[in-house]
Amino acid sequence: MSSLPLVVSFYTLDTPYEEEVKYLQASCESFQIENQIEGIPSAGSWERNCAFKPIFILKKMEECQRPLLWVDADAVFIRPLENLSVFSADFAVRIYPCPEDHPSKIVSATLFINNTEAARNLVYLWAKECLLMLEDKERVQEVWDQDALRRVLFTKAHKAQVVPLPVEYSKIVGHPGDEEECLDPVIIQNQASRRYKRWINHPEERLLGW
């Protein structure tokens, strides 16, 4: 078994992500990166599909019993995966230098999840927070899985050792700061949600040809 984490991801069937994920799959094949990337039915909305992320990760933790590296389906490997010091922690995530209550404080597009009980408990709390946010009848804002994770990391009791993931593992294409800071990325994130969110959320528009 490789000492590197197993790359895991999912994409939604019968959506544009079926084509988008092919770039991720091809990049994994090109660099011989071990991966398990699965197609799943859409839950009917972009936010519900995203909220499935921690549940999928828990499933993979149970099945694989090894460290995992989650990458969003619209990601692409630009160079080979390397063994990082952060892979000894329970959990690693990209953290921005902004206030802890900012919804974009962390970026969940790439995540390292170790095969530890502390990491498993953290992901469970994340899944629970996603569901609580989705079920909040008074909410007026869209639910982001990364905001649910932020809440868990900074406001919930957990025992996981959480460390920052290097920007090279989660460079956001088009982000001014990332473009300036990261010139040699391992993984780029293409933010396909900007193109496909409306497509997924409004099937009636597709039926009408809008």
Residue ranges of model-derived segments:
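N-terminal anchoring/stem segment of glycosyltransferases
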Residues: 1-66, 116-117, 157-158, 182, ...
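A short glycine/serine-rich beta->alpha loop
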Residues: 41-45, 94-100, 136
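A residue-level signal for conserved active-site and pocket-lining positions in enzyme catalytic cores
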Residues: 28, 57, 74, 111, ...
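Catalytic core and acceptor-binding pocket of nucleotide-sugar-dependent glycosyltransferases
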Residues: 119-210
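Short glycine-biased active-site loop of nucleotidyltransferases that positions the nucleotide triphosphate
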Residues: 49, 84-85, 177-180
